[in-house]
Structures are given as C-alpha cells and as structure tokens.
Design a protein with these regions (language model features):
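Catalytic-site-adjacent helices and loops of nucleotide signaling machinery
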Residues: 35
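Helix-adjacent hinge/juxtasegments
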Residues: 63-91
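HotDog/MaoC-like acyl-thioester-processing domains
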Residues: 8, 78, 82-87, 94-149
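Short amphipathic
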Residues: 14-23
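Single conserved hydrophobic/aromatic residue that forms the stacking wall/gate
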Residues: 1-12
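Active-site helix/loop of acyl-thioester processing domains in fatty-acid/polyketide metabolism
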Residues: 38-64
Length: 149
C-alpha cells in the first residue's frame, strides 16, 4: 500500500524516484535500519526532488530564499523493517496544493519491491524567508501536482 492505495501502479509510475544505499552505521541494536535514518534520507534526497521539479540546481536556499517550501507538518508511517545492506528507492509526489501550502507524499522502498517500508506525507507552507511571511504556492509546485486517483 503506497499513498493509501492498494496495488496502484499509477502512484508509482507518476512519481519522481531517487535512490540511496544503507550504511553500516544506519543499523540499530535490533539489527534493522534505525527509524531516524528514514527521515534523514528524505531530508537529504529532498533536494533531488526540488531540482527535478524546478529543472535546475541553482536557486536561493535558506534565509536568502524568497519562495521556498517550509516544512509545517509530517505524518509518518513505518510499515516494515529493513536490514542492511540494501539499496533503497525513494519516491516523491506532490498530491495536494492549496493557496499557500502543499503536500508531498514520499515512500521508501527496498529496491525491486512494490510496497514501501516507510511512507510520509509532508505538508509545506510556501514561505518568503527574506520578508518572513507565507506566500502563494509557486507555479512550479502547481504544475507538478499529481493527485491521487
């Protein structure tokens, strides 16, 4: 089950994917990938997703940004254990756009599997860091909306 749908190949096919390799240090005392590693991977790979939707790698980040997504909330679901070593596929998809916020569904899959081991819904607020205020969602986010069917 990914993004709340059973057996939906459409969800996977319409999503952006990147990958990561687990590291020995990712393993906890129970012998599986530690729960904190999943969120760390998503944070690290989020830039790949942003580069993909904007089609570039040069834009202002951080406190110089006049239009960036600011993480407002996340809903996290741990589905099954993962053991090292393994290649992970990370899927991202914008599934909801409001006037000033949007949702990104993300799933982490063991390479070759169709069901995720972990999934999240991150809600971002479009934010101008220079003026320190929320702003309307950028057209690039709207153009990349792929609603769940």
């Amino acid at each position: 089950i990914w993004l709340g749908l059973v057996g939906s190949e459409m969800c996977i096919r319409d999503s952006f994917f990147t990958s990561a390799q687990t590291r020995w240090r990712d393993v906890d005392t129970l012998g599986h990938i530690n729960h904190t590693v999943y969120l760390s991977l998503l944070e690290t790979k989020h830039k790949d997703f942003i580069d993909h939707i904007y089609g570039e790698t040069t834009y202002d980040l951080g406190l110089k940004s006049t239009a960036a997504g600011l993480l407002a909330s996340m809903d996290v679901t741990y589905i099954k254990q993962v053991h090292h070593p393994v290649k992970l596929d990370i899927g991202c998809r914008i599934t909801r756009v409001g006037s000033k916020s949007y949702d990104v569904h993300q799933g982490i899959f063991v390479d070759g599997e169709n069901e995720p081991s972990f999934q999240t819904i991150h809600t971002f607020v479009m934010f101008n860091f220079v003026e320190q205020k929320s702003i309307p969602v950028h057209h690039v986010i709207i153009d990349n909306l792929k609603e769940l069917e």
